[in-house]
């Protein structure tokens, strides 16, 4: 069946109808209508899957998509028109340009943690580029999956946009059907499997993965403001965010005070009993509760500054701050992807950078420092997919910035015009008229004068004699 859907959409693509800017704009308008007309239904579904409040569902899932959509729609014509470039002198008279051609049939495999935003944001780019698209929502966030599958045929062109539901095997079958591109968001382990599967078919992939995104806090910052911002970025969606601050390296002079300030910020945000707060979500399933709960020392342990409670039946893990933490502790063994925040004291930015470099390249890097030289040092020393200074997560929400990983945290970029680049083939075109004929000098037989001109063109500037390195 999945082979059939790829073939069916490819037939649609070959008619050329998706290349029309009007069609692309119509699909973007349809996406906007589907979101806004059913805003309450999306809020309910997100509440069922992840315990999100209506406000959090709107702020983290609906609003970012609408922002991205409006930005893309506003720039649609400009981004996708031919781009003239310079033509080398030897090809004059002539013209050169870059065409942004749609790829064809694109498969988007989306995750469960932001099940609406992370399937619709890439969909915006794929549709704007003129592709036919197959969306495979995560079966784990089943309420959103079912709602999307129900609504999509009533809004999108059904011959160009398809939704495939079901277990992970359905995604595997889609890859085997040889689409023109696969866009995957999820774990590094699954992303590796997707890349390997796609490589067998020579299908290009974009991988948006994750990792342990670190934070460095220097001794010169406002600790209260820093703590409040980190608390927001860490505990939104119960910590199940691919760019959440995974752990903190705090300067030893302020580490203990920072831990207390974050604990205070947790209480200010979610009250004395976060399980009663509508602003604090739930883990996706009991397996996630068990995995994250195993990272937490027993309640009452000296390094549990706040939280530590777990209710498996309610899928609840309390917002938890751990200090001090060692590199060998359970919370540092893998990406946490939950509401547990370890804080490790360090002697300074050099110590923090060296520790960060012992791990895979993260999707995000966060720096809290007033001293510009400290910020620049960390950014220069530590590679990452993206960086936010003075606030976590925020860079992901800008359609004017590329979003993507590096190394183990992913490959490829999207958002804004970077989605255009991901979902199009940048096609080189050079056009030269047959008259006047200016190419005769390079046609065989080659005359000595032409060879002399070429030799002079390749002569080193300012030194007519070539010298071997070191001579």
Segments from the language model and where they lie:
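Structural signal for hydrophobic packing residues in well-ordered secondary-structure cores
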Residues: 13, 17, 32-35, 39, ...
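Residue-level signal for inorganic ion chemistry
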Residues: 24, 69, 130, 161, ...
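ALDH superfamily catalytic-core signature
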Residues: 189-326, 350, 389, 451-452, ...
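Rossmann-like NAD(P) dinucleotide-binding subdomain of oxidoreductase/dehydrogenase enzymes
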Residues: 88-225, 261, 346, 470-471
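Conserved C-terminal structural/oligomerization subdomain of aldehyde/semialdehyde dehydrogenase
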Residues: 19-20, 316-471
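Short loop/edge segments at beta-strand edges and connector loops
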Residues: 80, 165, 186, 306-308
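N-terminal Rossmann-like NAD(P)+-binding subdomain of aldehyde/semialdehyde dehydrogenases
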Residues: 1-97, 470
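Short, well-ordered beta-strand elements within core beta-sheets of diverse protein domains
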Residues: 11-17, 108, 216-217, 247-250, ...
